[in-house]
Regions:
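Hydrophobic positions on the alpha1 helix immediately C-terminal to the Walker A/P-loop
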Residues: 56, 60
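Nucleotide-state-sensitive switch-loop elements of NTP-binding domains
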Residues: 22-46, 68, 72-143, 151
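The conserved Walker
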Residues: 49
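Preference for solvent-exposed, low-hydrophobicity sequence contexts
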Residues: 1-41, 45, 69, 170-381
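Short, solvent-exposed amphipathic alpha-helical segments in soluble enzyme
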Residues: 62, 88-89, 161-162, 187-191, ...
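Non-transmembrane, aqueous-exposed alpha-helical and coiled segments at domain scale
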Residues: 42, 61-63
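Phosphate/Mg2+-binding loops and adjacent switch elements
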Residues: 134, 138-200
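Conserved lysine of the Walker
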Residues: 53
C-alpha cells in the first residue's frame, strides 16, 4: 500500500484514503488492540521489514479514532516512509474528521538526509527526541510510533534500545515471527511502567525486495517533485548545514591562495574541518597526482585532503528549514557555482523564500523524476 505525500495550500498532506471498514484484523491482533484502547501515552511498534508495522498502525489508528481517542502518529521509517517523503521523520494527529476526509496534514517534519539510520544514528536519535518533545505539547491520548525495520545485529539492537530509553514509552508492540526482537525486549522486561505485547506478523503482508523498496521511494520522490521549478539561492545570505563533510560554505581564502601559489592548483573553495581540508577544484580541471595532495597535507598539517568538483553536489537532496530546525519541504541541487556563491535548486512550487531560514544538505542523491542515484565517494588522500 503506497501513501503519497500531497501538498495542499503549502502544507504537506498524507493521502490516507482507504476504506478501513473492509480491512480485516488478524485474530491475535484483536486483544492487543482492545487493550491499547485504554492505554494512554506512547506506543512504539517494533518489527523487522515486512512484518506489518504500518498495517497495524493504520488499523490501530482507525480503531482508536472511532472510539473518540485523540491519536498522534510519528513516522520514523526514513526508508519506507508513510507520512513525509523518504529521508524525513514526521508527525501528524488524527481525529474523526481527518480520517473521514482521507487527508492528514503533516504537522511537523524533520530532515534526516539518509534512507537508513546506519551512518547517522546520533542525528537520527536526536531528531526523534526533538519531534517527540513537540508531540508532548499536543492534546493526544495515544501517540503511536512507527519505526524502521532495522532491529537485527548490534546496530539494530543499539538503535531500538536507545529509542526506547530516550522516549520511555508506555507500551511496546513487538511483531516477531520467532525470537528476533528478544535481544531488545529482554532489556526492558523488568521495567514496571512498560507494557510489552508480543504478536505474530500478519501472514498476508507482501515481502518486498530491495528493488521493490527502491521503486517505492522513487515513486514517492517523483510524486513529490512533480511540479518542481528551479530557483537560485545565495549561500552568502543563507545558512547551509552539510551532512557530508560539515562544510559551512564559507571558503577559507587563505588556504585557497596558498594552494594556488605553492601547488599551482585552482581551487574555487577550500575549508579546514578538524583535521581534514576539503578542496573543491575548478572544472574541467583534472585531479592532479597523489604526490601533490601529500605535500598539501604536510604543508597544511592535516591528516586528510578531500578533493571534489562542483558537479559532485548535483542531485543531492536538501531540506528547507525554519529557524527552529523543522523542515518546510525538500529540494534537489541542480548545480552549485562556488565563484558566484549561488546554488540552483529544484524545489516544489509550494515552498517560497519566506518559508525557510536555512538549508540542510543530505546524503541522498535523487533526480527530479524520482530516480535514485548512487552516492559518489569523494577522492581522499
Amino acid at each position: 500500500m503506497l501513501i503519497f505525500v500531497e501538498r495542499v495550500r503549502g502544507k504537506e498532506m498524507v493521502n490516507f484514503n482507504n476504506n478501513y471498514d473492509e480491512l480485516a484484523m488478524p485474530g491475535d491482533w484483536i486483544p492487543i488492540v482492545q487493550k491499547l484502547q485504554s492505554q494512554d501515552g506512547t506506543v512504539i511498534v517494533l518489527g523487522k521489514s515486512d512484518s506489518g508495522k504500518t498495517s497495524l498502525i493504520k488499523l490501530l489508528t482507525y480503531f482508536l479514532v472511532k472510539r473518540n481517542r485523540n491519536i498522534g502518529i510519528i513516522d520514523l521509517d526514513i526508508g519506507q516512509s508513510t507520512l513525509g517523503p523518504p529521508a524525513t521523520i514526521a508527525m501528524s494527529t488524527v481525529d474523526k474528521k481527518k480520517l473521514k476526509d482521507g487527508n492528514i496534514p503533516i504537522e511537523h517534519m524533520l530532515f534526516i538526509g539518509m534512507i537508513s539510520p546506519v551512518g547517522c544514528i546520533d542525528r537520527f536519535l536526536d531528531r526523534i527526541c526533538k519531534l517527540y518533545s513537540i508531540s508532548q505539547k499536543k492534546k493526544i491520548d495515544t501517540l503511536i510510533v512507527d519505526t524502521t525495520g532495522l532491529v537485527m545485529g548490534s546496530i539494530g539492537i543499539y538503535l531500538k534500545s536507545s529509542l526506547i530509553n530516550r522516549i520511555n514509552p508506555a507500551a511496546l508492540v513487538a511483531l516477531q515471527s520467532a525470537q528476533e526482537l528478544e535481544p531488545i525486549l529482554s532489556q526492558f522486561e523488568s521495567r514496571p511502567s512498560l507494557q510489552i505485547y508480543r504478536i505474530k506478523p500478519c501472514q498476508n503482508i507482501v515481502q518486498r525486495s530491495w528493488r521493490d523498496r527502491k521503486l517505492r521511494r522513487e515513486k514517492q520522490f517523483c510524486h513529490y517533485f512533480r511540479d518542481s521549478r528551479t530557483r537560485e539561492v545565495d549561500f552568502t545570505t543563507t545558512t547551509i548545514r552539510d551532512f557530508n563533510f560539515g562544510l559551512s560554505f564559507c571558503s577559507d581564502n587563505d588556504i585557497v591562495d596558498t594552494i594556488k601559489q605553492k601547488f599551482a592548483l585552482e581551487p574555487v573553495y577550500a575549508e579546514k574541518i578538524q583535521n581534514t581540508v576539503v578542496l573543491i577544484l575548478q572544472e574541467p580541471q583534472s585531479i592532479p597526482g597523489k604526490d601533490i595532495f601529500i605535500n598539501i597535507k604536510k604543508h597544511l598539517q592535516v591528516e586528510q585532503v578531500i578533493s571534489i568538483f562542483p558537479h559532485w553536489f548535483q542531485y543531492f537532496l536538501i531540506s528547507f528549514n525554519t529557524a527552529d530546525g523543522f523542515s518546510n519541504g525538500l529540494g534537489i541541487i541542480k548545480n552549485i557555482d562556488f565563484e558566484k556563491k549561488k546554488i540552483t535548486i529544484y524545489m516544489p512550487g509550494s515552498i517560497s523564500a519566506e518559508n525557510f531560514s536555512e538549508i540542510e544538505l543530505g546524503q541522498v542523491r535523487v533526480k527530479p523524476d524520482g530516480t535514485e542515484l548512487p552516492y559518489n565517494e569523494p577522492v581522499k588522500f
